Amino acid sequence: MPVVFRERGFRFHFYSDEGDPREPLHIHVYKNGIDAKLWLYPEVVYANNHGFDARTQRWIVTVVQDRRGEIERTWHDHFGTGA
């Protein structure tokens, strides 16, 4: 499970086995037993959320938007796909 970064105790990561065929670019977020998955394109939106409150969800979206380039580079480096 490649961890892209950690911020405020949240782990932003993806899994090495992201489906066959592989799912589109996305990020998983985890903290204290709560998790969510966000699609990165065409805009940052939740695929699912299992317990984060509305304020935390807004903060997560902002972080993912701000660091989308880093997430995308890490994804492509890991899977060997072109950007």
Regions found by a protein language model. Give the residues of each.
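A broad, low-specificity signal for short, low-complexity segments enriched in glycine/proline
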Residues: 1-2, 24, 33, 75-76
